[in-house]
């Protein structure tokens, strides 16, 4: 399930934590040591924990669960957007709006507005408006697309959150915990792993390292979805139809 090697993590700098003076003591069990006042993360712990995460999300995906990808810092935005789209999961890559989970009913109204504006634009209705009105609606559409475009088709609260940098995204984590939504999080040496259900100890500032974590999660989700499809096809193909004119069993594949 986990297709990443120790060498790949090392080359991406996944083992580099933060400066020792900024460390969180609760991360001590994941720290190998320090070099030049920088904490070194023990990748021998990261690798199996990343494997646990991929196994978990694969099981979720096989059961058609929704996993919300969250990464709004510069090092995570591109990877979050690219891989979430690739595996068909909702994502937040711009700015976490307070209440995005805990006040989802209100957020859903904004999503309806986003869909309404997109439909109006696709039908060319903006072209029939006066320039000022069309410009205002275009700006509103762009703002909503930037903030909510990634969760436009989420269709309700997610079944789990996958977060890059649990400190930076602490509001998202707090909202998920309040709603008892499981949290998967990349945790660097300056943050606490408390209240994170599935911890990935690792550098959350390296774009290459972040891309590895997110890619692995997305790959596992796709594997889970595929296993669900294969299982369904296999189950269908095992259906036996018995006819009154024959004693033979025929397998009917749909």
From Swiss-Prot:
GO molecular function (one): structural constituent of ribosome
A GO CC term assigned to this protein in UniProt: cytosolic small ribosomal subunit
Record-linked Pfam families: Ribosomal_S2
Matching InterPro entries: Ribosomal_uS2, Ribosomal_uS2_bac/mit/plastid, Ribosomal_uS2_CS, Ribosomal_uS2_flav_dom_sf
Keywords: Ribonucleoprotein, Ribosomal protein
Keyword tRNA processing recorded: no
Protein name as it appears in the record: Small ribosomal subunit protein uS2
Lineage, highest ranks first: Bacteria, Pseudomonadati, Pseudomonadota, Gammaproteobacteria, Legionellales
């Amino acid at each position: 399930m986990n297709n990443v090697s120790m060498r790949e993590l090392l080359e991406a700098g996944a083992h580099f934590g933060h400066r020792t003076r900024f460390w969180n003591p609760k991360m001590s069990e994941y720290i190998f040591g320090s070099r030049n006042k920088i904490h070194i993360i023990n990748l021998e712990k990261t690798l199996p924990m990343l494997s646990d995460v991929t196994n978990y999300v694969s099981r979720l995906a096989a059961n058609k669960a929704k996993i919300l990808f969250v990464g709004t810092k510069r090092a995570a935005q591109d990877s979050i957007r690219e891989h979430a789209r690739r595996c068909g999961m909702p994502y937040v890559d711009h700015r976490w709006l307070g209440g995005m989970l805990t006040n989802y009913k209100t957020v859903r109204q904004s999503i309806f507005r986003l869909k309404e504006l997109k439909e109006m634009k696709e039908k060319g209705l903006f072209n029939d408006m006066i320039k000022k009105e069309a410009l205002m609606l275009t700006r509103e559409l762009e703002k909503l697309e930037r903030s909510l475009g990634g969760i436009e088709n989420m269709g309700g609260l997610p079944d789990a959150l996958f977060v890059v940098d649990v400190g930076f995204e602490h509001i998202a984590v707090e909202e998920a915990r309040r709603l008892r939504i499981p949290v998967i999080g990349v945790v660097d040496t300056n943050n606490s792993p408390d209240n994170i259900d599935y911890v990935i100890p690792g550098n959350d500032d390296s774009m290459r390292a972040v891309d590895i974590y997110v890619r692995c999660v997305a790959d596992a989700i796709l594997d889970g979805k595929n296993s669900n499809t294969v299982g369904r096809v296999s189950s269908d193909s095992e259906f036996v139809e018995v006819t009154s004119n024959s004693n033979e069993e025929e397998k009917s594949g749909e």
